[in-house]
Each structure stands twice: as C-alpha cells, then as structure tokens.
Amino acid sequence: MAKKSAVARENKRRKLVEANYKKRSELRKIAKSLTASEEEKENARVALNKMKRDTAPIRLHNRCLLTGRPRGYLRKFAISRICFRQMASMGEIPGVVKASW
C-alpha cells in the first residue's frame, strides 16, 4: 500500500494538469509555431516557464486504483499486476480467464 501522501500528491497533480491543459497547449503551440514572430515565441516560452511544474503532464505517474502502487501498472485495467493477479484468480475481472493450452 502506497503512502496516502503520495497518492494525494498524484491526485493534486492530475487536477492541476487538467485545469491548465488548455492554456499550456496554446502556449506550446505558439512557441513551436513557424508563423509567429520571435517575440511572441519568446513570450510564450517565458509564460510556460512561469507556470507551475506540476501543471506539466509529464510529471504524472500512473498508480493502481486499489493500492496506489506506482510500478507494475496495467493501463487496460488501471490496477497493478499484483491486484490484477489476485482479482483474476478470484474471477472478479469479467472476461479474464487463466490461460491453458
């Protein structure tokens, strides 16, 4: 089980990313634009640098919904490999069966 503070920090980051996604993407578009002037590009870069670090999507890390475990995360199920194995063996995940051939 992950620390509650680590899970809370990750949730806070997700909210910040979601709230600032539109503004950040517009600034990035201007900074990479071929038609914008150099001054506009520089202003966009400065504005991006002034934004909080936690608003950047790269700082997000996927965590298990049940335990908060940051490693061994399965995207399709949004849980860790350990929780997946336990739930699959107990038949709690629909459509998942143990392989046999």
Curated annotation (Swiss-Prot):
- Which GO molecular function annotations are given, in alphabetical order? rRNA binding; structural constituent of ribosome
What UniProt keywords are attached to this protein's entry? Answer: Ribonucleoprotein, Ribosomal protein, RNA-binding, rRNA-binding
- Cellular component annotations (GO), alphabetically ordered: cytoplasm; small ribosomal subunit
Query: In Gene Ontology terms, what is a biological process of this protein?
Result: translation
The organism sits in which domain of life?
Answer: Bacteria
SUPFAM superfamilies, alphabetized: Glucocorticoid receptor-like (DNA-binding domain)
Whether Amino-acid biosynthesis counts among this entry's keywords is no
Tell me, what's a Pfam family for it? Answer: Ribosomal_S14
Question: InterPro entries of this UniProt entry?
Answer: Ribosomal_uS14, Ribosomal_uS14_bac/plastid, Ribosomal_uS14_CS
Q: How does it assemble?
A: Part of the 30S ribosomal subunit. Contacts proteins S3 and S10.
Q: Which PANTHER family match?
A: 30S RIBOSOMAL PROTEIN S14, SMALL RIBOSOMAL SUBUNIT PROTEIN US14M
The task this protein performs is described as:
Binds 16S rRNA, required for the assembly of 30S particles and may also be responsible for determining the conformation of the 16S rRNA at the A site.
Question: What family does this chain come from, according to its entry?
Answer: Belongs to the universal ribosomal protein uS14 family.
Query: What protein does this entry describe?
Result: Small ribosomal subunit protein uS14
Please name the source species. Answer: Chlamydia felis (strain Fe/C-56)
